[in-house]
Amino acid sequence: MNFNVIIDHTLLKPQATSQDIKILIEEAKKYNFGAICIAPIWVKLAKKELKNTNIKIVTVIGFPLGSQISAIKQKEASLAIAHGADEIDMVMNIGKFKEKDFQFIINEINQIKKEIGTKILKVIIETALLSPHEIADATKLVSSTNADFIKTSTGFSYRGASEQDLKIIKENKSEKLAIKAAGGITNLADMENFYRLGATRFGTSKSVSIIKNLTDKKNEY
């Protein structure tokens, strides 16, 4: 499996500068990562720097809490696409989910998908803040929307993706809904395990060390 192309090489630290983003982009070019994942403020810069490459630009909406007003999320998504984003990773409104206002969640996701058209939409459910039963319910809920992916985590909570998360999501998702594992993915073993459990995209800031490890592993044979 060529893991490089299914990695979203990620830099979402609030202290990231334009120079940090340029370094991220150069790494993505060097290691042939499928995408970079950055804050919306850097999308225009990335679009310029990634000209004439196949590397996709992923940005985050309603990040990292998910509690912004829906209209603000829609506008943020619309502007991100206008600036050159190829994919949107939005955070579900976790409070609304917790109080079982499921129609609110469905409407918000579908409104943002309508705003971005054919661009890819991933919905972050922040598994660290959900019980196993809630992860199952959230997966079914996202499956009922027009979202393209369900994503485990922002990377800003107390833990990221786990094996249990992936198993629950796989058991409860629709056939059309893809899985992005993110948060705390620091080594090749994690990535291989999550891939076996159904994840087809990975968000990590440790992409370079993971791929170097993969190369070293291949060279052992």
Swiss-Prot record:
Pathway: Carbohydrate degradation; 2-deoxy-D-ribose 1-phosphate degradation; D-glyceraldehyde 3-phosphate and acetaldehyde from 2-deoxy-alpha-D-ribose 1-phosphate: step 2/2. The keyword Lipid biosynthesis does not apply. CDD domains: DeoC. It catalyses: 2-deoxy-D-ribose 5-phosphate = D-glyceraldehyde 3-phosphate + acetaldehyde. It is found in: Cytoplasm. It comes from the Bacteria. GO terms for cellular component: cytoplasm. Disulfide bonds: none annotated. Its EC number is 4.1.2.4. GO terms for molecular function: deoxyribose-phosphate aldolase activity. Coiled coil: none annotated. It is an enzyme of class 4 (lyase). It holds the Pfam family DeoC. The active site is at D89, K151, K180. Keywords: Cytoplasm, Lyase, Schiff base. InterPro entries: Aldolase_TIM, DeoC, DeoC/FbaB/LacD_aldolase, DeoC_typeI. One of its GO terms (biological process) is carbohydrate catabolic process. Belongs to the DeoC/FbaB aldolase family. DeoC type 1 subfamily. PANTHER family: DEOXYRIBOSE-PHOSPHATE ALDOLASE (PTHR10889:SF1). Catalyzes a reversible aldol reaction between acetaldehyde and D-glyceraldehyde 3-phosphate to generate 2-deoxy-D-ribose 5-phosphate. HAMAP family: DeoC_type1 (MF_00114). This is Deoxyribose-phosphate aldolase. The lineage of its organism: Bacteria, Bacillati, Mycoplasmatota, Mycoplasmoidales, Metamycoplasmataceae.
